[in-house]
């Protein structure tokens, strides 16, 4: 028997991207633009299947809008999912909240509309891991010791040393590899984030604590995601982010304390359902994983990164 999601419920499907090339190698990725592995693509396909099954069982439309970071691993994840949904993603970089174009079809009841707007923002990017980016987690653990390593990784105020962009960012369009000893580098910001750099109100980070991720993400959540949900009376949306950006969303939506957030770990590629009450200012109702057993096992693996070898 099919159940129906109550009409007052807005459903957010939150997802950490599928496994990336650097997740697989146990390397701090941050703003390095790592692609998905084959396992990561399979995780994206399986996530789409779980969401589709959930929507069908609860008489809920598939997500009508999607959100990703500006990093390729989230874009590849959502594109793979859209392929499973048989939807055509319409990608749009958001660098100004007042310049969003959703198309005439958005918000209509047309079940035959196969297009889905995908809004991409740097505000959903992974936490910037400063000089730890591109470094193997066991090596960083050895250098800093367990207590400082875990404080910087998990505490709300923990912050790595800043990145030296002269050494750890690609300096020109056709640069290959590295002559500075850094095997993995950030993309050139003037190219990758050209639109953001044209908006002088945007200051891109060189290192971040989780508090700073919450601070830069919250305006997008309030002024875009939740505003559009209200404006178009959306029943569901899909947000593909990163470990730290998903943790930040949960902290804001659920009201998790600064101390308790350090105990929240987000596994790759397992959809998390967050229900909000439309009749009460989109207030948090509840959250649950669509594959809770796998989520528990893999969240524990996330917590232990650096201490144990990745499978």
Curated annotation (Swiss-Prot):
Enzyme superclass (EC) = isomerase
GO MF term (any one)? phosphoglycerate mutase activity
The record lists the catalysed reaction(s) as:
(2R)-2-phosphoglycerate = (2R)-3-phosphoglycerate
- The annotated site for Transition state stabilizer falls at 242
Q: Which residues form the active site?
A: 17, 126
GO biological process terms, alphabetically, are: glycolytic process
Disulfide bond positions: none
Q: Is this entry keyworded Isomerase?
A: yes
HAMAP family in the record: PGAM_GpmA (MF_01039)
Q: Which family is this sequence assigned to?
A: Belongs to the phosphoglycerate mutase family. BPG-dependent PGAM subfamily.
Q: What is this protein called?
A: Phosphoglycerate mutase 2
Q: Which species is this record about?
A: Saccharomyces cerevisiae (strain ATCC 204508 / S288c)
| Native organism taxonomy | Eukaryota, Fungi, Dikarya, Ascomycota, Saccharomycotina
